[in-house]
Amino acid sequence: RVLFRSKWNNGSGSLFFSPGHVVPRIAGGKVFIVAPDRVVTCLDLATGKQLWRDNSRKSRETTGLSGDGRRFYYKTMDGELAAIDTSAERYRELWCTDLGWGYEYNSCPAFVRDGVVYVAGRHGTVAAVGEDGTLLWSVKCCNSGGNDFAQAPDGSLWTTFAEGKVFRIP
């Protein structure tokens, strides 16, 4: 028999009626999450103890982690992608890049490959941002929210959208 024990909660007994795709990202002995409460939270991996929380930006559940684990990425409700330093003792933002999308709430996980962060938006948009925060490109593919990204054995990147469309990203 397996018993699950809660390690942490945000202290609220309220339900959040919004997309709630909370994906834990683990780096350097820490767990990073963004929940529907729109706060970036960092927990100690071993104990579950809350190390810090930050609500300086209206964060959403789109998150990712750099290949080397040094940067945690999250999207904001203002259509930005932010990167924070995972080794810092407190919240330390490295950069925040405007994707040019305006109000944004889609919770498709970010995909990180070869130093590029890929994110999908609520209106059929996909953007690529360099690990230094440079917006490389942003394209409108369709009209619905992005679901997820997957890399094929040949290295090509694929993404899907809620309206059933599938796209290959070169």
Predicted features along the sequence, with ranges:
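A short beta-strand motif characteristic of beta-propeller blades
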Residues: 6-14, 49-54, 92-100, 134-139
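Short, positively charged, low-complexity/disordered linker segments
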Residues: 125-128, 136-137
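Repeat-blade elements of multi-bladed beta-propeller folds
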Residues: 10-40, 54-82, 101-126, 143-167
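Short, small-residue-biased leader/transition segments that mark boundaries at the very start
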Residues: 1-3
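Short loop/turn segments that connect beta-strands within beta-propeller blades
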Residues: 44-47, 86-89, 130-134, 170
